[in-house]
């Protein structure tokens, strides 16, 4: 029988699927990390605040509900100001994310091994003394205007938005009682919210696959085609084809950051002349040599988590492999109209 989840995990699970953490209470963490899509949203780029529905069927609503408690306009609904605003990066799966020492595509939440505490770019988060990258990571989407915060909380800095989320939970009798039961305190603390969400995500570890059975000696667990693919992947058939240089170990990642010349699509992160470039790791390290570098993803369950790369530029694993094989040709011939609205083509032009 399946072991019953602890009260902490149950609390984290409820928070993860509850829209109470978002500004207008219209979406939850699960909107972009849903079990139906292997804990992604199946989209190239996500629709956060102002969206309706799930996955590839999610669309921008005409109106935006403003939370009554923090309404700026005095109206319950306003014209949706987020129409057309896609999240800049592809929503990664959180399956096995508990095993990663860096979180986010740019690694802006990182456990560097110097001491026990996680380092981020935000002093308010660092001041919590969190030792779990998952816990620190959980505190960022709720303050992102386009992802979850919206405009219901007003133009407040991140730590004040988090304070309002905690206040909302405290005023909710159900959650107030749940937190007191789990943590034994009369008032809810921000770090408790973070630890509860992290506890749920730590349950999402899946490490049994045909490949695991194969390396344990069950040679029949892979087809002959898969075995030939593995020999190519590990550079045994062709040394020049050695995916394991970056995708190695149990998680098939080197935990590093690389510039793979992935076509720039989407709204970007403020880089370049148009502001639509995404400089990736350089936005964290402030080192120009890290421009366009992104975290090497784990290949665990990769067949379930399309589309691929930091901005969802490619829809299939075959396209990803072809890009690696001919980076320049693949980039020059890339047609972004397949994936995103023309407004967000960035520096990439449709193929002639």
What is each residue range found by the language model?
Residues 1-352:
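Periplasmic c-type cytochrome electron-transfer domains
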């Amino acid at each position: 029988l399946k072991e019953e989840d602890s009260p902490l995990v149950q609390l984290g699970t409820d928070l993860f699927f509850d829209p109470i953490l978002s500004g207008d209470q219209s979406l939850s963490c699960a909107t972009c990390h849903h079990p139906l899509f292997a804990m992604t949203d199946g989209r190239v780029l996500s629709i956060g605040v102002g969206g309706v529905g799930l996955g590839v069927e999610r669309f921008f609503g005409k109106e935006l509900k403003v939370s009554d408690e923090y309404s700026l306009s005095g109206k319950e609904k306003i014209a949706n100001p987020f129409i057309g605003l896609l999240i800049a990066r592809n929503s990664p799966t959180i399956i096995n994310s508990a095993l990663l020492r860096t979180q986010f595509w740019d690694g802006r939440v990182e456990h560097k091994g110097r001491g026990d505490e996680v380092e981020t770019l935000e002093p308010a988060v660092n001041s919590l003394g969190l030792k779990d990258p998952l816990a620190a990571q959980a505190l960022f989407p709720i303050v992102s205007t386009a992802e979850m915060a919206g405009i219901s909380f007003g133009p407040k800095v991140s730590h004040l938005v988090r304070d309002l989320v905690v206040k909302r939970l405290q005023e909710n009798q159900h959650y107030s009682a749940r937190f007191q039961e789990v943590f034994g305190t009369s008032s809810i603390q921000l770090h408790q919210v973070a630890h509860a969400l992290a506890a749920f995500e730590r349950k999402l570890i899946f490490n049994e696959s045909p490949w695991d059975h194969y390396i344990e000696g069950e040679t029949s667990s892979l087809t002959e085609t898969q075995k030939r693919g593995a020999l190519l992947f590990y550079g045994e058939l062709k040394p020049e084809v050695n995916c394991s240089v970056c995708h190695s170990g149990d998680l098939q990642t080197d935990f590093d950051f690389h510039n793979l010349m992935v076509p720039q699509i989407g709204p970007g992160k403020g880089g370049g002349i148009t502001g639509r470039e995404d400089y990736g790791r350089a936005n964290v390290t402030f080192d120009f040599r890290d421009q366009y570098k992104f975290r090497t993803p784990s290949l665990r369950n990769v067949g379930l988590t399309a589309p691929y790369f930091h901005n969802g530029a490619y829809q299939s694993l075959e396209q990803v492999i072809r890009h690696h094989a001919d980076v320049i040709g693949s980039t020059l011939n890339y047609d972004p109209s397949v994936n995103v609205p023309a407004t967000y083509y960035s520096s990439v032009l449709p193929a002639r």
